[in-house]
Amino acid sequence: MARNSRIRITNNDKALYAKLVKNTKAKISRTKKKYGIDLSNEIELPPLESFQTRKEFNEWKRKQESFTNRANQNYQFVKNKYGIVASKAKINEIEKNTKEAQRIVDEQREEIEDKPFISGGKQQGTVGQRMQILSPSQVTGVSRPSDFNFDDVRSYARLRTLEEGMAEKASPDYYDRRMAQMHQNFIEIVEKSFNSYWLTDELVERLKKIPPDDFFELYLIFDEISFEYFDSEGEDVEASEAMLNKIHSYLDRYERGDVNLDLKGF
């Protein structure tokens, strides 16, 4: 393997080095003064004599040029009316993730709106009609993120919450986890509502065998598969033996393959 020969510093190198250092220091000073952001630890300014090879110098030069390049949005900043400062890269990333999270929710709602809504064993319209009467988030348990507007952010804590939350919600895995958590929560609330009751125990065992994505669709379609009829504190429980039997009948239909579930892989 060929060795990189030691650099021979030319007058052009000296002039370029001086220019890059000047531009970098000006960028650091300007950013600190205008936005209160100290970038001095983001970039190194070693003495010209410290470079051992031409490759080292060229790599340093590339970093300086990138740092001062106006197209590099990691180091371009915006301050809103509340004095909150963020890089354009961060703002764009939150906007991108927000739009992706909205797209996923919109796609999900479109997939489920024509599904039947069944209460008391009879169809009472569609899931889409129910979303119009209530709200989509009430029906699905999943809210659609609002548009991101940096001008509305009043604190860095809020900005961090939005950044982390939208990054999470932009991932389809997030909704898989939500379905799994909803499934587990429903099983637990059924268990706690009646403590120990043979019909409930049997229902819990049947529910545990259902994949979370299938449970989510059953939750959307069948009115009685609802958190509002069960109470983990044992008070104001509306669930009765008749209702439990109705849920068992729905699970019978599911196990026979009589319920159209087509959100697999959503």
From Swiss-Prot:
Residue segments, region Priming: 173-266
Any GO MF annotation of the entry: hydrolase activity
Protein name: DNA terminal protein
GO cellular component term of the entry, any: virion component
Residues annotated as transmembrane: none
Alphabetized Pfam families for the sequence: Phi-29_GP3 (PF05435)
Source species of the chain: Bacillus phage B103
Annotated family: Belongs to the phi29likevirus DNA terminal protein family.
GO biological process: DNA replication, synthesis of primer; symbiont entry into host cell via disruption of host cell envelope; symbiont entry into host cell via disruption of host cell wall peptidoglycan; viral DNA genome replication
Keywords: Covalent protein-DNA linkage, Degradation of host cell envelope components during virus entry, Degradation of host peptidoglycans during virus entry, DNA replication, Early protein, Hydrolase, Phosphoprotein, Viral DNA replication, Virion, Virus entry into host cell
Organism phylogeny: Viruses, Duplodnaviria, Heunggongvirae, Uroviricota, Caudoviricetes
Keyword Hydrolase included in the entry's annotation: yes
Superkingdom classification of source: Viruses
Disordered, as annotated region: 1-73
PTM sites of type O-(5'-phospho-DNA)-serine: 232
Major location category of this protein: virion
Subunit structure: Interacts with the viral polymerase; this interaction allows the initiation of TP-primed DNA replication at both viral DNA ends. Binds to ssDNA. Interacts with the replication protein p1. Part of a DNA-gp3-gp16 complex.
Site keyed Positions the 3' end of the template strand at the active site of the DNA polymerase: positions: 230
Region (Interaction with the viral DNA polymerase): 256-258
Localization: Virion
Summary of the function given for this chain in its UniProt record: Acts as a primer for DNA elongation during viral genomic replication. Acts as the small terminase protein during packaging. Recruits the phage DNA polymerase to the bacterial nucleoid. Primer terminal protein (TP) is covalently linked to the 5'-ends of both strands of the genome through a phosphodiester bond between the beta-hydroxyl group of a serine residue and the 5'-phosphate of the terminal deoxyadenylate (dAMP). Hydrolyzes host peptidoglycans during virus entry.
InterPro entries assigned to the protein according to its UniProt record, in alphabetical order: DNA_terminal_Gp3, DNA_terminal_Gp3_C, DNA_terminal_Gp3_sf
Region (Intermediate): 74-172
SUPFAM superfamilies xrefs: DNA terminal protein (SSF140919)
